[in-house]
Amino acid sequence: SSAAGRATNVELSAAKINGVVLNPGEVFDYNAVVGKRTAEAGFKVAGAYAGGKVVQEVGGGICQTSSTLYCAALFANLEITQRDCHMFAVGYVPWGMDPTVSWGGPEFRFKNNRDYPIKIVAKTENRELTIEIWGTDVDGSYVEMTNSVSTVYSSKYPSVAVGTKAITYRNVYDKDGKLLSRTKEDVSV
């Protein structure tokens, strides 16, 4: 089934990123680490977005892993160097916090902009995916993500809703809760 294939693909992609260590300045490249999604590599057929619709393809569902990793990278206050959103909303992360990935297509990359190594820890248990980024806490700062979601209307027919727009902000606070910075992370339409 598509659900079983998706679960296998999420487990397999999580296993491939688990344990990756990035030294200062190194860039994590999701497609390079996970590799080409093929049946020979163990990936299964499951639902994926392509060409404006849901299709069945080998590796479908791995964007849940890339999206969970993206959220972990944001909360670790790492530098996102490449990310494209899905053409439709996804149900596993908040609006505007989903990077779509595809072999030979959209990419997701982030840079370890810290002065120390970081490690990706990914696991699946009972069909739940958890991803953490381990590193050294040097100042006690923390990140909160916020987003502003609005309806997009047709320019030709102003009363017709044609989509949704999400603007995502990264808010960095010091250990005492004082806002240090608020950065527009991305706009998803």
Features from the language model and the residues they span:
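Well-ordered beta-sheet/strand-loop patches within structured domains
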Residues: 1-189
